[in-house]
Every structure is written in structure tokens, then in C-alpha cells.
Amino acid sequence: MGFSFGLLIWAPMAFGRAGARSNLISDNYLTFVSVYALLLLSDVLFWNCFGFDRSAVQAYFLAPLKMSTVLLGKNVAAICLIFLEITGVSVVCALLRLPLSGLKILEAFSITCVVTLLILSIGNLSSLYNPRPVNPSKSFRTAAGGRTQAMLMVAFPLALLPVALAFLARYAFDSEWALFGVLFVGAALGAVVYAYSMSAAVQAAEDRKERIITALSQGEGPIET
């Protein structure tokens, strides 16, 4: 979704007007598309990562497997998918001869990495405190619950705060080094937050085991209960 919709939605705003070739969106087109892809995929990859497992989630609690390993595996899979999508968008932008450079690609990957790290920190907890079974045939609009959409409206701007500070630093110091410096600090803080949220998520999984299985077993699922 982010690959197709991101390119189609942001392209008119970035390059649609004559003489508007140099503005915030066009200069950072790949970054905008990458962050938009995160937004579109956030419910499946972050906020409710056990949704498609549904009743099969009980296998995670029955198998001799640590919940931290399960969460880490899902997080790594989400990161790989996001980075694969950004790579695809970068290739398409290059083929279409859109304004693109090695620095802009590095910037887009760096920003996406920081935002993803912060979203994963929140999403691991959300997936265990607000688990919902998801039907793969349903769209994002019908699959995401009201509580999840409200959380997205609050959490996503918070995750974008280091990015906003990085852009402000680049504007203030007129230097790309300032942007990457702020992003590095944001990544370091994000790593600390992620480590804390992982331990909290593991504890939540242990304390809420029955409620998680019950919530995800509602309706049809891969395992009959």
C-alpha cells in the first residue's frame, strides 16, 4: 500500500505545480513516502502484531519459547518489510528520474529507522494490552478499531518528534550533519525506550495470558477452539 499509494498521493503535491520543484515535499519526497508507508502498515506491523495469528497465538504460550523472542522475531520481520518497501520506492523514483541522491536515500532510511524504533516500542505494548483478531480480507479501515485509531493519532506524532527536531536542526545550522546528529540521538533514546518496552511487554504477556488468548480467539481463526 505504501509503495503504490505513497507515490501517487505525494507526487502531485510535490511536483504538481509549475515552479514548485523546490519545496519541503519535493526536496524530501522519499522521506515523506517512507513515513506514509509506515502509517499505512502500522496497524498490521506494529499496533496489533498478533492480529492475524488470532487463536494460533496460544501456541506462543504453550511452546517452550520466550515471548521476547516472539516479539523480536515479529519486529525484525516488520523492519525487513519496511526497508524492502523503501528500497522499492527508491528504485521507482530513480527510474522515473525524480529528484533523488545518495544523501536523500540515506536520510530517508535514517528517519524511517528512528520512527520505526519508537513505533515498535509502543506497538509491542499495544499488541498485548489491546489485542484484536484481524480478518485478512478486511481493509485497514474496517480492521482497525476505534481505540487503535485514537492511539495512532497520539503515538504517531510523538514518534515523529525526533524527525521534526532533526529538520529544525538542519534549518538552524544549515548542515546535514546537524540533521543526522539529532537523528543519532533520537535513535539512541529510541533504543533505550525499546528495551524498556520489551521488558514491559514480556511481563504484560505473562500477566494477561488468558485475556490475550480469549480476545484473539473470538471469531474464526487458524486453530479451532
Task: Kindly give the residue locations of the regions a language model identified.
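Hydrophobic alpha-helical transmembrane segments of membrane proteins
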Residues: M1-Q58, M67-T225
